[in-house]
Amino acid sequence: HAEHQGRWKNREELAERMISLLGQLYREKNIVASVYGRSLINRSVIQILKAHRRTRVMDVELSVVHTYPILEALAKVENIGSAEVDLGKLAVEYKEKGGDINAFVADAVQSLEGNAKTVAHRDVVLYGFGRIGRILARLIISQSGLGRGLNLKAIVVRKSSDGDLEKRASLLRRDSIHGPFSGTISVDEENEAIIANGNFIKVIYASSPAEVDYTAYGINNALVIDNTGKWRDAEGLAQHLKCPGVARVVLTAPSKGEMKNVVYGVNHTDILDEDKIISAASCTTNAITPVLKVLDDKY
């Protein structure tokens, strides 16, 4: 009993130490640390320990005893940033190779040197704020880091009734499937905005794309994600490109016509720089295509 309790307390202590280092790397260098794909950012002690236990389904025996030294060595590496680092995979590789852990980690992340200053941000506008829009908002906000990468700057909706802003904020806070929002949300009625985890998200009320000048809100070179499904062809979605401040458009539904339907991990390399409008395909397509690709590649 004493042995098991002592082991548990030791792992709790290591997880507590990890929280500080994880936060430091995330805030100062925009590094998202994970364990076999599961992010450790903003996680509790128990959640960190559980993330390690879940590796058993991949026949990997891993604990914070193995990953904490990797994280500690990672924190010592200078001039890196804007990346996801899988502590679990590095820990397994280190167990096989051995040697000086600081040298091993420094060599493993060598390709990330200089990243801290090279990743520019991209303004994002959600055109529509239904279920898909709100889930997208959660994902973008959770990865907003220090303002590099995707920055959710605005949502465009039709004004429904009095108290519209508070209602939309409430729907973002709570989801019947995905649970409560991870963080804090407040409403700025005067400036018609939602503040989520420190991100100022302007709520623009408009009935059509033609009504919006995004540059008036400090939004430039933006990616508009149309999640309304109202327009599904290139001609209809091209309305967004005519708005000042918009550079590209993504549709969150299967497209019509010749527009590319893209599933990341399957055909994302088909996207060309001249493609200003693409479709992210349907939820069914995204769910089944990666599995079909694996089967097709294998058999």
Regions found by a protein language model. Give the residues of each.
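N-terminal Rossmann-like NAD(P) cofactor-binding subdomain of oxidoreductases
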Residues: 1-299
